C-alpha cells in the first residue's frame, strides 16, 4: 500500500525546469532512496512534497489525501516531516529544550513551552535522545555538539512528533566517515522499531545501497530510473548520468 503518491508533478523557477512530469510512489513501512547528480531536482521534489514549494502541476497524495495545496504545518500534522542537509536546531538551547520546542512543531511561545513541562514529555525527550545516542549530552547546548551529533539531534526532534513518514535530505552529509555506519544503523532502527516510512536523498551510493529497498534516480529534473539497489547499480543510464555530471 502506498503512503506517498506523486503523479505528474512539475515545478519551475522562472525558465528553469526543476522537476518535469515526475511520478513515483512510496510503499508504507519501506525505506526508499532518491539519488541523482547535483541539480537533478531532488531537494526541489522534497520541498514540494512537504509543502514548501507550490507545484505548477500534478498531484501529491499522502495516505490518499491530496496535500499539494496544503501549507507545511498542516502537512506536518498529518504525519509527513522532513530533515535538512543543513541542520535546523536551536544552538543556544540544550538538547532537551530542542526536543521540547520541536514537539508538535510548537507554535506556542518559548515562555509558555518551558513554564510548565509535562513529565511525560521530558521522559519522551530523554528516551529519544537515548535512542540516538545523545542521552549523556542532553544538558549540553546544541551548538556545542559536533555536526554529526546535531544531525542525530535533528532526527530525534523529528521523532518527537511521531511522524508516519520522514523525508531525510542527505543524512550523512558532512559527517565523519567513521560515524556513517552508526547513522545507517539508527535509520534502519527508526524504520523497524517505530514503523516509520523513510524517503532518503543520499549522495553516497554505499549508504543508499545499504539503506534502501527501492531507489529512484532523477536527472535533469526528470525521473530517469527506479528499481532495487542491484538494478540501479547496473543501470547504464544511471551510471552515465553520474559520470556525465563529473
Write out the residue ranges for each language-model feature.
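Catalytic Walker B motif of ABC-type/P-loop ATPase nucleotide-binding domains
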Residues: 166-170
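Conserved ABC ATPase "signature" region
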Residues: 112-137, 178, 185-188
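Conserved catalytic motifs of ABC-family nucleotide-binding domains
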Residues: 162
Amino acid at each position: 500500500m502506498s503512503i506517498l503518491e506523486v503523479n505528474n508533478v512539475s515545478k519551475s523557477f522562472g525558465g528553469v525546469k526543476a522537476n518535469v512530469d515526475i511520478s513515483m510512489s512510496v510503499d508504507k513501512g519501506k525505506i526508499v532512496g532518491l539519488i541523482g547528480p547535483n541539480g537533478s531536482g531532488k531537494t526541489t521534489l522534497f520541498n514540494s512534497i512537504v509543502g514548501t514549494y507550490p507545484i505548477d502541476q500534478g498531484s501529491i497524495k499522502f495516505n490518499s489525501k491530496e496535500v499539494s495545496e496544503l501549507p507545511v504545518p498542516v502537512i506536518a500534522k498529518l504525519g509527513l516531516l522532513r530533515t535538512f542537509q543543513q541542520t535546523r536546531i536551536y544552538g543556544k538551547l540544550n538538547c532537551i529544550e530542542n526536543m521540547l520546542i520541536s514537539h508538535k512543531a510548537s507554535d506556542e511561545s518559548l515562555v509558555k513551552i518551558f513554564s510548565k513541562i509535562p513529565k511525560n514529555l521530558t521522559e519522551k525527550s530523554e528516551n529519544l535522545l537515548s535512542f540516538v545516542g545523545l542521552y549523556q549530552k542532553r544538558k549540553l547546548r546544541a551548538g556545542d555538539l559536533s555536526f554529526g551529533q546535531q544531525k542525530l539531534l535533528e532526527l530525534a526532534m523529528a521523532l518527537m512528533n511521531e511522524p508516519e513518514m520522514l523525508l531525510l535530505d542527505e543524512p550523512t552529509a558532512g559527517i565523519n566517515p567513521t560515524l556513517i555506519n552508526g547513522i545507517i544503523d539508527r535509520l534502519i532502527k527508526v524504520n523497524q522499531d517505530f514503523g516509520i516510512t523513510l524517503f532518503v536523498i543520499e549522495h553516497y551510493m554505499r549508504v543508499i545501497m545499504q539503506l534502501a529497498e527501492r531507489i529512484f534516480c532523477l536527472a535533469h529534473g526528470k525521473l530517469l530510473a527506479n528499481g532495487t539497489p542491484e538494478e540501479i547499480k547496473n543501470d547504464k543510464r544511471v551510471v552515465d548520468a553520474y559520470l556525465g555530471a563529473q
